[in-house]
Amino acid sequence: MMQPKKTKFRKAHKGRIHGVASSGATLAFGQFGLKAMEPERVTARQIEAARRALTRHMKRAGRVWIRIFPDVPVSKKPAEVRMGSGKGAPELWVARVKPGRVMFEIDGVNQQTAKEALTLAAAKLPIKTRFVARIAE
């Protein structure tokens, strides 16, 4: 699972995801990609599940790029603990994804295989997505 090696602070504010993605909104590496259509926090487990679905369907042919990284810690209090007495311990890591952000890119496979693989990966994510392809030059 992905998580930062070192962070400046142990805990983060919840925050909100405003606006649309300005950086990371176009394909940079591969021929095909999966683009987010709504704002959402995507966990490290969800990213890993999507990556596994992608590589499994592609039968390890081609190349996969993960364009998001879970760098925000989410804290949680233990079960059946009364409110108060501080913020809970860090439980999981999430990536804040804005609409328009390209989350996954793949290359080295044909368009039909790419679309099928990215559809399977999209099913593992809590977010509406769209298949994007680089225009042939």
Curated annotation (Swiss-Prot):
It comes from the Bacteria. SUPFAM superfamilies: Ribosomal protein L16p/L10e. Keywords: Ribonucleoprotein, Ribosomal protein, RNA-binding, rRNA-binding, tRNA-binding. GO terms for cellular component: cytosolic large ribosomal subunit. InterPro entries: Ribosomal_uL16 (IPR047873), Ribosomal_uL16_bact-type (IPR000114), Ribosomal_uL16_CS (IPR020798), Ribosomal_uL16_dom (IPR016180), Ribosomal_uL16_sf (IPR036920). GO terms for molecular function: rRNA binding; structural constituent of ribosome; tRNA binding. The keyword Ribosomal protein applies. GO terms for biological process: translation. The keyword tRNA-binding applies. Disulfide bonds: none annotated. Binds 23S rRNA and is also seen to make contacts with the A and possibly P site tRNAs. Belongs to the universal ribosomal protein uL16 family. Part of the 50S ribosomal subunit. This is Large ribosomal subunit protein uL16. It comes from Rhodopseudomonas palustris (strain HaA2).
